[in-house]
Amino acid sequence: MTRIISGLAGGRRLRVPPTGTRPTSDRVREALFSALEARIDLEGCAVLDLFAGSGALGLEALSRGAEHVVLVESDAKAAAVIKANIGTVALPGATVRAAPVAAVVSGPSAREYDIVIADPPYAVTDEAVVSILTDLQANKWVGEGTIVVLERSSRSPETVWPQGYEPIKAKNYGEARIELATCYGLDS
């Protein structure tokens, strides 16, 4: 079990998929949202949560005031858990896309997101992560000023962000490393 830390749904317990996911710890989630809230007001934001797992990161954003959250998860069992967790949080504005992240972001987006959170399995290669980051820009999922949060293993090298992203911060929390970057666009 994990829980929503703060906001309208603070304290509500969330289910976690039985296998195949690595939920972000409460400590890391709190640090991540502190770093985000120091840079952007979550109120009214559109958030894209990639490799959503239990949905805890995206639902935390919703609880803290995000207007709309899209949670992308390829595993059908995990997507079902996310749907149940949306019911538990009982806030409007959450949508689940049960599909592979690479397939979703390789197509055009109907909107640019203010925040993108990507927590891929540690086994996902750096090249695959960079490809996803590149597709986010090319297909208009992100725009100038979008903040991108990436969770990776603290044992792996820091991400080499593709053109169009400016790294802001990277910090290790035990086994996890949180990296933040801002999108400045390919035309800058």
Predicted regions and their residues:
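Class I S-adenosyl-L-methionine-dependent methyltransferase catalytic core
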Residues: 1-188
